[in-house]
Design a protein with these regions (language model features):
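Pyridoxal 5′-phosphate
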Residues: 1-217
Length: 217
């Protein structure tokens, strides 16, 4: 998934094409874990990295690293745990001194996610994005930079207003409507909108109203 627009890429197809040429694949899945219903091994990639604070709601500072078992021994990180065998993936997690309370939240976050259900959460995220984006996709002056097809996007979308720089749009949304967004200034131009499962349709109605008022001004 592309973070600035929410596009879902056909990773399995890309991995297969790369492997056919003898190329190993590392996937940046920062916005997928806790967002999309999938299993990393099904992608076929050699390496996969993700943030856990984005959609799994773990505190800042926690991440995920997946390495195919036969690839672990070939990796030589700058910092590593020298007490582990070369084929032990735990040597790639050089902890040092850090806030251990973050690690202690990971299991609770996973349990909460599993209680909701991966499929239910993905469906909810896609519903929320469609709820607001379909109300403005054809509205004069508003530009949607995210695909309409459900299989090509989920919770994230990128929206802009003609003639208004993303940073200006983000500032107006915050200052005038108390709505916080992320300004994206290329390669697509707009604001990234990222509701979560607790976002209400009433809140999205306020956002749609704000976008339309700005587009009309």
């Amino acid at each position: 998934m592309i973070n600035i627009s929410g596009h879902i890429l056909p990773i399995k197809n890309i991995v297969d094409m790369a492997h056919a040429k003898g190329v190993e694949v590392m996937v940046d899945g920062a916005h997928t874990v806790g967002h999309l219903n999938f299993k990393i091994p099904e992608l076929g990639c050699d390496y996969f990295g993700s943030s856990l604070h984005k959609w799994l709601s773990v505190p800042l500072g926690a991440g995920l690293l997946y390495v195919k078992k036969d690839k672990v021994s070939k990796i030589n990180p700058f910092f590593s745990d020298g007490d582990r065998e070369t084929d032990d993936i735990r040597r790639l997690n050089h902890i040092g001194t850090h806030p251990v309370h973050t690690d202690l939240t990971i299991l609770d976050s996973i349990n909460y996610y599993q209680t909701i259900g991966a499929e239910r959460k993905e469906d909810r995220m896609r519903f929320l994005q469609k709820y607001w984006s379909e109300q403005v996709r054809e509205y004069p002056g508003i530009i949607l930079n995210t695909p309409k097809e459900s299989w090509r996007s989920c919770g994230i979308a990128n929206v802009g207003v003609e003639g208004i720089q993303p940073s200006v749009l983000a500032k107006r949304l915050l200052d005038e409507y108390n709505i916080w967004t992320v300004a994206i200034n290329g390669p697509v131009y707009g604001c990234r909108i990222t509701p979560n499962i607790y976002t209400t349709t009433e809140e999205l109605d306020q956002f749609v109203k704000a976008l339309k008022e700005i587009a009309d001004s």
